[in-house]
A protein has these predicted regions:
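Short, low-complexity, polybasic intrinsically disordered segments
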Residues: 129-140
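Short aromatic-glycine-(Arg/Gly/Cys) micro-motifs in beta-strand/loop hairpins
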Residues: 1-14
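Ribosome large-subunit tunnel/peptidyl-transferase-proximal elements
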Residues: 19-21, 25-28, 33-35, 43-123, ...
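Short, charged/polar surface micro-motifs in flexible loops or helix N-caps
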Residues: 124-128
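C-terminal structural segments of small proteins and small subunits
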Residues: 142-144
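Active-site lining segments that contact anionic ligands and/or coordinate catalytic metals
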Residues: 2, 147-149
Length: 165
């Protein structure tokens, strides 16, 4: 299982991932990473479901606005957002969200997309395919065909208290 931990180091909050069989083992790994004398304070630990699409033939720059729009939404709502988007990134993000839902159901026994939230949806730059375009007088200009990685992290939705003020 994958667990997400939040930690505070020198006044800034950051996140990291740890692989473990259960929450106690994950907590032990996090405690080993940050010993008691360090200035880092672990804020929380929760189980997440991760899916990654690697080396997608698209520029990460063009798909990042759509990825940001999906963050914080329920998985079913995020699928609706990307389904009606005309961008090329929509197909890649949709497949990755569906893969993360399938990972949650098949590998970890989650109940489905109804109670999962998109915690993180990022498009990161990958390698570039180098090509050359022939130009005048026998010279050539380099062309970089960009690729990207899409990573989606789903977490269990927090149950909100109805009627709370």
């Amino acid at each position: 299982m994958t667990f997400l931990y939040k930690f505070n180091k020198n006044g800034t909050t950051a996140e990291g991932y740890v692989q473990a069989s259960d929450e106690a083992a994950a907590q032990a790994k996090v405690d080993a990473k940050f010993p008691a004398g360090s200035k880092t304070k672990v804020l929380g630990l929760e189980q997440v479901y991760v899916a990654t699409t690697r080396n997608a033939r698209m520029s990460a720059f063009k798909g990042r606005p759509l990825a940001r729009a999906c963050q914080g939404l329920k998985a079913s709502e995020a699928l609706k957002v990307v389904e009606f988007s005309p961008k090329k990134a929509a197909d890649i993000i949709k497949k990755t969200i569906l893969s993360a839902i399938a990972n949650a159901e098949n590998n970890h026994g989650a109940k489905g997309a109804a109670d999962l939230t998109v915690k993180l949806c990022v498009l990161e730059e990958s390698v570039r395919m180098r090509r050359y375009w022939p130009t005048a007088r026998g010279s050539a200009h380099p062309i970089a065909r960009r690729l990207c990685h899409c990573r989606v992290v789903l977490a269990e939705s927090k149950k909100s208290k109805k009627g709370a003020k």
